[in-house]
From Swiss-Prot:
Span list, region Coil 1A: 24-55
Residues in LTD domain copies: 653-764
Any one GO BP annotation for this protein: heterochromatin formation
Compartment(s) where it occurs, according to its Swiss-Prot or TrEMBL record: Cytoplasm
Annotated spans, Linker 1: 56-69
Location of region: Tail: 621-768
Region (Coil 2): 225-620
Protein name: Intermediate filament protein ifp-1
Family, as annotated: Belongs to the intermediate filament family.
Function noted in UniProt: Cytoplasmic intermediate filaments provide mechanical strength to cells. Not essential protein.
Gene from which the chain derives: ifp-1
Source organism, top-level taxon: Eukaryota
Chain positions covered by the region annotation Head: 1-23
Region of interest called Coil 1B, as start-end residue ranges on this chain: 70-207
Length: 776
């Protein structure tokens, strides 16, 4: 019994040592986390340095203010990197010290375990095996976490590389697009720094909470367990002592009773001597056992005192480490505060630059020269070096007068010759010729198709962000070329009336022989799509006013017999940040004379398609009448629908799509904001729980898993919204900004068995125009 109790005590002490070893392993894991965080910061530094090199190679200007900002930012980042490297070396040194302490503790534990009495070798081997298994488990978990972090970094780097490729294609634009790209890159950099700051704050707070919780909770639990184990050992020893005393007393009473009852008349001294010797031997054996137990108790008491001293030393060391970490956290908070102040300064500078650019653009638009796109690099440098806003108005007046004088005498074509490597300078000083009024373009009702959509809803595509600058530059280059060739008259330098974007009318100017301007109000089909307010409301309003004035000037009629300029209407995209204006690639609008019919590609396509053979198609005319349906063709027990949809009143501005379905559920519509599913049945419900909606565009695909248990009632519909669209609360959201509505897109829905139940494809889309924008 004594040996068993001693063995239990040793097992308990071994468990306590294992728990301490686990604590040391946790501390080591924490230091490994810190080292990995340092590696992550180095990777972030590499990415930021790469971004800086790209920006440095992209911006070709003599702006000393921008270079100064870059130099200050580089010095700040380098100082932060040096601080991080110093802290990394300190953490590595601390890790080596802790590893040496762990090795010393392990050697001491092994020595103590070997010197302990009564511990079997197989139990010790089992302990070693358990420790080795736990260590391997911990190492495996750390490796898995490290690989997950690496995969995440690789995905981020791939995304950044793709963004860099798309951004490098836009470097050929003029000064305004280049400035916009620079501002966009700077905003992304600031956003990443803010995200990094928030992540660092979260990590610091989590580590602080973990340290405090670990120190205050586990220490008391360990002490309570140790005290409880000591009390149990003492109770077991006391119970064993009482039980042994009772057994000895009962045995002695039985022996005395036996001797009294069986003792003969003659006393046998030899037997008495033998019994006395046996009793002495038993007593000596008991005394030896008691001495051994006392020695063992003394050794255990010494070990307990030693462990108490070791725990107190570890507590002191950990408290010192915690204070050092708290100081480092305070330093990092101060650095984060300084970075936040710098970011606020950069944001203020960005706002000032945007306001300055907007004002210069307004002055250039009022000067009447559509070829002036942005201020020069000297103007940007002077704006960067300006300390207050007191001299802005004077500078505006001086710059505007200089620009008006320059644009009244010289017209330089730079953007058109940048692609061929030559620059042509010409001077045109003729005045606009009075011309009669021209009839506006009216839609041909016979070939106009309607669709339940907004009258001006440009098809969204992920490639559209890339092609906006090209569309803007192509419009300006076309205007400059035709102006230099004599097709377009030079716009007058007088101020043009400001037309508000919220008005529902458009002014069409007719110049008479006397030069008097007659205005006529025409219903504006674009009035229902006025952009809403945003953060840069003032800048957006100035851009809208300037673009409306420019379009108003470009819509003036031209001489009869001359070439009509190829003007593309400018549309404001509500989804773009700051209401970035884009040029829709609609077919060119030409004057329509009386008695003449302008054939289009889609007219011939409709005539040819009607002769190909029977197919299921439904064309909806503008009057609301439905054409006769033709026979249905079955494909894999499904139905294919060929249809057309109109996005505006022009006969050439509509979309054709083909959809196929098998069963009750079909994809009825795909727009930039949502994808609509419809239950075709009028009597039975459709269970779409677990279905997967797949949206493929280009070389990418996005899928959405519908909620389990989702049931569509008869003739009910479900909309899966894009992330950037306006939707009600609790709707199904896809992880994509806006759905692609080009001919390069395939939208399908699959059931739980991965069977295709319906798909939707656009077969033609005149709003997209050039297909070269979609090849990557």
């Amino acid at each position: 019994m004594d040996s068993a109790n001693a063995r239990d005590c040793l097992l308990h002490l071994a468990r306590a040592k294992l728990s301490e070893r686990q604590d040391l392993v946790q501390l080591n894991d924490q230091f490994v986390d810190i080292i990995e965080h340092v590696h992550y910061m180095e990777a972030e530094h590499t990415a930021l340095e790469h971004d800086y090199n790209l920006l440095k190679s992209g911006v070709q200007s003599d702006s000393s203010g921008i270079n100064e900002i870059y130099n200050v930012e580089i010095r700040t980042v380098r100082s932060g990197i040096e601080e991080i490297n110093r802290s990394r070396h300190e953490l590595l040194n601390e890790q080596t010290q802790l590893s040496h302490q762990v090795k010393e503790a392990e050697q001491l534990w092994r020595h103590t375990a070997k010197s302990a009495l009564g511990v079997p070798k197989e139990v010790d081997d089992e302990f070693h095996r358990i420790c080795h298994i736990k260590m391997e488990d911990c190492i495996t978990k750390r490796r898995i976490k490290y690989m997950e972090d690496k995969l995440r970094l690789i995905k981020q780097n791939n995304g950044r590389i793709f963004e860099h490729i798309n951004l490098m294609r836009m470097r050929k634009d003029q000064a305004v697009s280049l400035q916009q790209e620079y501002l966009l890159r700077k905003n992304e950099l600031l956003h990443s720094i803010r995200n990094m700051e928030e992540d660092n704050k979260k990590i610091i707070m989590n580590e602080h909470k973990y340290f405090v919780r670990d120190r205050n909770a586990d220490r008391h639990v360990f002490r309570d367990q140790l005290r409880k184990a000591i009390a149990d050992i003492r109770a077991d020893y006391e119970a064993n002592r009482l039980r042994n005393e009772e057994e000895i007393r009962i045995r002695l009473e039985r022996e005395i009773h036996r001797m009294n009852t069986t003792m003969p008349g003659v006393v046998c001294y030899d037997k008495l001597r033998e019994e006395l010797s046996i009793v002495k031997n038993n007593l000596s054996g008991l005394q030896k056992q008691v001495s051994e137990v006392e020695i063992r108790n003394n050794s255990l008491t010494q070990q307990i005192e030693f462990y108490r001293l070791e725990i107190s030393e570890n507590n002191k060391l950990f408290e010192d480490t915690l204070e050092f970490k708290i100081k480092e956290i305070e330093k990092m908070r101060e650095q984060c505060t300084a970075i936040s102040v710098e970011l606020e300064k950069l944001c203020d500078l960005n706002i000032d630059l945007q306001k300055e650019i907007a004002k210069y653009r307004e002055l250039l638009d009022r000067s009447g020269d559509p070829r002036a796109n942005a201020p020069s690099t000297q103007v940007i440098a002077s704006a960067l070096s300006r300390q207050n806003y007191s001299s802005i108005s004077d500078h505006h007046s001086r710059t505007s007068s200089g620009i008006v004088q320059h644009t009244a005498h010289h017209a330089v074509r730079d953007s058109s010759s940048s692609r061929t490597g030559t620059t042509i300078h010409e001077t045109i000083t003729h005045t606009p010729i009075p011309i009669p009024a021209t009839l506006p373009v009216q839609p041909i009702r016979e070939y106009t198709y309607s669709r339940d959509a907004s009258p001006i809803r440009p098809s969204y595509t992920p490639y559209q962000q890339e092609s906006r600058a090209d569309s803007r530059s192509s419009l300006r280059e076309r205007i400059q070329i035709e102006t230099l060739q004599g097709t377009l008259p030079v716009l007058p330098s007088h101020s043009v009336e400001t037309i508000r974007a919220s008005d529902n009318t458009r002014l069409v100017r007719d110049l008479s022989a006397g030069g008097q301007i007659n205005t006529t109000q025409i219903n504006n089909p674009y009035a229902s799509r006025t952009p809403t307010s945003s953060v840069n409301d003032r800048i957006a309003s100035e851009r809208r006013d300037s673009e409306i004035r420019r379009n108003d000037a470009l819509h003036q009629p031209y001489p009869i017999g001359g070439a009509v300029p190829r003007v593309e209407p400018t549309i404001f995209n509500e989804r773009a940040p700051g209401y970035t204006h884009i040029n829709s690639n609609f077919p060119l609008i030409t004057p329509v004379t009386e008695g003449a019919t302008v054939p289009s590609y889609y007219d011939t396509f409709n005539r040819n398609s009607s002769q190909r053979g029977p197919h299921h198609s439904s064309y909806h005319a503008a009057t609301g009448s439905v054409s006769n349906s033709i026979s249905t063709t079955l494909l894999n027990e499904g139905s294919i629908e060929h249809s057309s949809s109109s996005d505006s009143v022009d006969e050439d501005n509509f979309q054709r799509f083909t959809r196929w379905y098998k069963g009750r559920v079909k994809i009825s519509d795909v727009t930039a904001d949502f994808v609509q599913l419809v239950n075709r049945s009028s009597k039975k419900s459709a269970d779409v729980g677990g279905f997967k909606l797949i949206h493929e565009f280009g070389n990418k695909s996005v899928y959405v898993d519908l909620p389990v248990g989702l049931i569509l009632a008869p003739k009910d519909s479900l909309k899966i919204y894009a992330r950037g669209a306006t939707h009600e609360r609790g709707a199904v959201i896809a992880e994509i900004d806006f759905f692609d509505t080009t001919i390069h897109t395939n939208t399908s829905i699959r059931n739980t068995n991965n069977e295709v139940k319906s798909w939707f494809v656009y077969t033609s889309n005149t709003e997209i125009g050039d297909a070269d924008h979609h090849h990557h």
